[in-house]
Amino acid sequence: MGTRLKVLRVFKQLQRTRMDVFKDDDIALKAARLKINEEFRKNRNETSEENINEMIKLGSNVETVLRESVLQMEHVGEDKLLLRPRKSLLLENVPYCDEPRKKS
């Protein structure tokens, strides 16, 4: 696949992830869009294949961190925050046992 297509794919992945991660938060959506666009514009004239591949890898890593690590919270009172996790971040709850298992 051409380098140009790889760059475009990472750009689109970042934009889609931004829309999912910061859903219903207009300020964060706009800030993320501006930052993504700024970084891609800043490196628009890069010609070194090695540097481009490194930046593609960095963009993919950033997208993964956003998708897997960022949680939305909103202020609902003076000292209260409402956590709004996405379904992809929820893990299966495994019961905790205080006693060690008996060997059979």
From Swiss-Prot:
The keyword Chaperone applies. InterPro entries: Complex1_LYR_dom, Complex1_LYR_LYRM7, MZM1/LYRM7. Belongs to the complex I LYR family. GO terms for cellular component: mitochondrial matrix. GO terms for biological process: mitochondrial respiratory chain complex III assembly. Interacts with UQCRFS1. This is Complex III assembly factor LYRM7. It comes from Tetraodon nigroviridis. It is found in: Mitochondrion matrix. The keyword Zinc-finger does not apply. Keywords: Chaperone, Mitochondrion. Assembly factor required for Rieske Fe-S protein UQCRFS1 incorporation into the cytochrome b-c1 (CIII) complex. Functions as a chaperone, binding to this subunit within the mitochondrial matrix and stabilizing it prior to its translocation and insertion into the late CIII dimeric intermediate within the mitochondrial inner membrane. It comes from the Eukaryota.
